[in-house]
């Protein structure tokens, strides 16, 4: 008898198989007991008939509790009405562990109740579907960059300096010295790009922002890319290619999950390059034309981003922000030094910024000047300045927030569902 994953049952019609998993749900009509079993790859209905199975097996099936772990043996047969189109005529059942009364029933529960039991909430079909799409996005990112000759170069999580100032950093004690949890691997990406040409890193990022919104996490994952001899336009094109590739990949490989999430995939099929673009200055004019009192030099908030992105209905690049509201390393536009060669990619449907990036300053003296303007200590960035002393070249990069991308693709209302164990302003457990 072969051990089979539920997702592969269609290949075993008429054969006897062994399924190992957990009881998701059950129902009984008196003479027949239906066991809905999950194994992480799908759901299958096990049918236990009292007359055929015998009194002992039927009684065991009737007494098993929700989320008990089990091993189920039986013959696979087609049944269009059953989950997945197949069911198992059960001939054997073994309880691995009889679960205690399960706290999460199939009825509706409040968000706080579920968040406190996130370690169990992820077992539900909806949450599992989201995590499967997340896995597909992570695999897709790696495939995309590897196919374009980018090298994976891991960046440190503990850093001695801040990438964009210390205001939103988690400070830790590093053997008596101040250190910080990384808010970006970008500075290190710039160093490895000078060695390897094209690089990317994939890891957790930490922001101590006092933000309690549906878009914000204290800990989230970013894929960050950096490439030597890449200018602003090269960078924009790479971002367009990446996002459209990932959307297309999920549409192709996660149809079942998107259907379970009831995602309107029609809103994703048109995500193809080139994406619309709007300069920061034009965006300010657009907002004012809609009756919003917005001054040039201010940074966009969530309502502004939503208004802009909904105007296009597609991901849109907002580019050439004022130099004073962007990071110290952003390269000023040679044609207008008041703005930088940077861009944010806004997702439609109110999901906000999913990518931030731009061309970096490659001139030593200008970078020093920018450090002073941002009140950052030059001595802490000597290693970073070295990159402009020894073979400096034009280079560009960006960071993509995995959870925001996932939330948009899945149509998730709150970003807490886009990561297995969210860390939010007032929640650190489980």
Curated annotation (Swiss-Prot):
SUPFAM superfamilies: Class II aaRS and biotin synthetases (SSF55681), Nucleic acid-binding proteins (SSF50249)
Pfam families, alphabetized: tRNA-synt_2, tRNA_anti-codon
Catalysis performed (reactions): tRNA(Asn) + L-asparagine + ATP = L-asparaginyl-tRNA(Asn) + AMP + diphosphate + H(+)
UniProt-recorded name of the protein: Asparagine--tRNA ligase
Gene responsible for this protein: asnS
UniProt family annotation: Belongs to the class-II aminoacyl-tRNA synthetase family.
InterPro entries, A to Z: Aa-tRNA-synt_II, aa-tRNA-synth_II, aa-tRNA-synth_II/BPL/LPL, Asn-tRNA-ligase, Asp/Asn-tRNA-synth_IIb, NA-bd_OB-fold, NA-bd_OB_tRNA
UniProt GO BP: asparaginyl-tRNA aminoacylation
GO terms, molecular function: asparagine-tRNA ligase activity; ATP binding; catalytic activity, acting on a protein; nucleic acid binding; transferase activity
């Amino acid at each position: 008898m072969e051990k089979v994953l539920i997702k592969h049952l269609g290949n075993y019609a008429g054969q006897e198989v062994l399924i190992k998993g957990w009881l998701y749900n059950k129902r009984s009509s008196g003479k027949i007991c239906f066991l809905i079993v999950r194994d992480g790859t799908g759901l299958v209905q096990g049918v236990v008939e009292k007359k055929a199975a015998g009194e002992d097996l039927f009684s065991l099936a009737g007494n098993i509790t929700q989320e008990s772990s089990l091993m189920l043996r039986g013959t696979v047969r087609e049944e269009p009405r059953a989950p997945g189109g197949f069911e198992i005529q059960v001939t054997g059942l073994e309880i691995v562990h009889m679960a205690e009364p399960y706290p999460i029933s199939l009825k509706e529960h409040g968000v706080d109740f579920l968040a406190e039991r996130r370690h169990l909430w992820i077992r539900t079909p909806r949450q599992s579907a989201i995590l499967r799409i997340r896995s597909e996005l992570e695999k897709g990112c790696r495939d995309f960059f590897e196919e374009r000759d980018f090298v994976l170069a891991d960046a440190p999580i503990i850093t001695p300096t801040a990438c964009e100032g210390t205001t939103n950093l988690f400070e830790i004690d590093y053997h008596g010295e101040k250190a910080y949890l990384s808010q970006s691997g970008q500075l290190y990406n710039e160093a490895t790009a000078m060695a390897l040409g094209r690089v990317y890193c994939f890891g957790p990022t930490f922001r101590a922002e006092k933000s309690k919104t549906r878009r914000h996490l204290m800990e989230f994952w970013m894929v960050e890319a950096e490439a030597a001899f890449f200018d602003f336009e090269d960078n924009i094109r790479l971002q367009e290619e990446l996002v459209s590739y990932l959307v297309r990949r999920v549409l192709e490989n996660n149809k079942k999950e998107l259907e379970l999430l009831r995602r309107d995939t029609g809103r994703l099929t048109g995500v193809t390059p080139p994406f619309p673009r709007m300069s920061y200055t034009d965006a300010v004019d657009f907002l004012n034309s809609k009756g919003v009192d917005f001054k040039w030099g201010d940074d966009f908030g969530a309502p502004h981003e939503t208004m802009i992105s909904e105007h296009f209905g597609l991901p849109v690049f907002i580019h050439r922000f004022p130099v004073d509201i962007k990071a110290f390393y952003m390269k000023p536009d040679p044609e207008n030094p008041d703005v930088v060669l940077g861009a944010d990619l806004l997702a439609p449907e109110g999901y906000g910024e999913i990518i931030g990036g731009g061309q970096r300053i490659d001139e030593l003296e200008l970078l020093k000047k920018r450090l002073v303007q941002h009140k950052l200590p030059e001595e802490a960035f000597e290693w970073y300045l070295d990159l402009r002393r020894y073979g400096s070249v034009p280079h560009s990069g960006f960071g993509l927030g995995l959870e925001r991308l996932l939330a948009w693709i899945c149509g998730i209302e709150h970003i807490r569902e886009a990561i297995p164990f969210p860390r939010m302003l007032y929640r650190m457990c489980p």
